[in-house]
């Protein structure tokens, strides 16, 4: 079991076969989720409930909410607004948000603003045989919407992503058991052959405790890092030049 503040060396990166990626604050700005996605869902909710409150296709999302919210539209709306305001990460809210974002992505109103280094690096790693997997507190359907509608060219990165994990099929991201659960799905790959990239130091520590290599990703708008997570082998500001599997991508500026 690795230390929560263990460093990741160039040799460690060269041995990596799987990159596990967080989303918010790692591949796209935190502000996209808080300032674009969350408000969009709240704005779309009343119109959606006008049309869908009693419809069979909306029933799974509505019935996933606890009572009395599931039976009362005013309570439902108030509960959603409260959860969003407090940034509570519960699976039934995440599923509803993904449902509400679908129309926005499909209409082109929403495009995920990936950092410039993300798409070129992910494609370079994929071309080098590195498996790419997503792990986010957002639901798997919402993850696929985001990576299917980005500002990159081509806009969809779904074809190069091998698997998707959220708090439902893996567990909470700050618990080492969640990373152990993900590892168990890939018994032919050793923990030390995984690299988890996230802006959250507690998630990074949990992944390291499960035996993965992990780096804190420092992006504009992210919270300042604790001193123990600052330094070479602890944090990165860009995926560019990160020689995962011995493959270094330095093309993001020209892509």
Curated annotation (Swiss-Prot):
Binding site for substrate: 136-137, 173
Top-level division of the source organism's lineage: Eukaryota
Subcellular location: Cytoplasm; Nucleus
Pfam families per the UniProt record, alphabetical: Hydrolase (PF00702)
Cellular component terms (Gene Ontology): cytoplasm; nucleus
Cofactor(s) listed in the protein's UniProt record: Mg(2+)
Entry GO MF terms: acireductone synthase activity; magnesium ion binding
Reaction(s) catalysed by this chain's protein: 5-methylsulfanyl-2,3-dioxopentyl phosphate + H2O = 1,2-dihydroxy-5-(methylsulfanyl)pent-1-en-3-one + phosphate
Gene3D superfamilies documented for this protein: 1.10.720.60, HAD superfamily/HAD-like (3.40.50.1000)
Cofactor note: Binds 1 Mg(2+) ion per subunit.
Family as reported in the entry's similarity comment: Belongs to the HAD-like hydrolase superfamily. MasA/MtnC family.
Subunit structure: Monomer.
Entry-linked PANTHER family: ENOLASE-PHOSPHATASE E1
The name this protein goes by in its record: Enolase-phosphatase E1
Organism: Verticillium alfalfae (strain VaMs.102 / ATCC MYA-4576 / FGSC 10136)
Origin organism lineage: Eukaryota, Fungi, Dikarya, Ascomycota, Pezizomycotina
This protein's encoding gene: UTR4
């Amino acid at each position: 079991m690795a230390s929560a503040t263990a460093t990741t060396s160039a040799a460690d990166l060269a041995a990596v076969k799987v990159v596990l990626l967080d989303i918010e604050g790692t591949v796209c700005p935190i502000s996209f989720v808080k300032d674009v996605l969350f408000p969009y869902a709240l704005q779309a909710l009343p119109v959606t409930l006008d049309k869908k409150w009693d419809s069979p296709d909306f029933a799974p999302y509505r019935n996933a909410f606890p009572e009395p919210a599931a039976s009362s539209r005013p309570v439902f709306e108030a509960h959603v607004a409260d959860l969003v305001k407090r940034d509570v990460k519960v699976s039934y809210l995440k599923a509803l948000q993904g449902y509400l974002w679908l129309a926005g992505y499909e209409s082109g109103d929403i495009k995920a603003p990936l950092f410039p280094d993300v798409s070129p690096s992910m494609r370079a790693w994929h071309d080098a045989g590195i498996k790419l997997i997503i792990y986010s507190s957002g639901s798997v359907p919402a993850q696929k919407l985001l990576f299917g509608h980005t500002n990159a060219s081509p806009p969809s990165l779904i074809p190069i992503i091998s698997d998707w994990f959220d708090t439902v099929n893996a567990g909470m991201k700050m618990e080492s058991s969640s990373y152990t659960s993900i590892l168990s799905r890939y018994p032919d790959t050793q923990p030390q052959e995984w690299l988890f990239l996230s802006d959250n130091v507690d998630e990074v520590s949990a992944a390291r405790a499960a035996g993965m290599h992990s780096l804190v990703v420092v992006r504009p708008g992210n919270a300042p890092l604790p001193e123990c997570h600052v330094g070479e082998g602890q944090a990165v500001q860009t995926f560019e030049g990160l020689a995962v599997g011995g493959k270094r991508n330095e093309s993001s500026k020209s892509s």
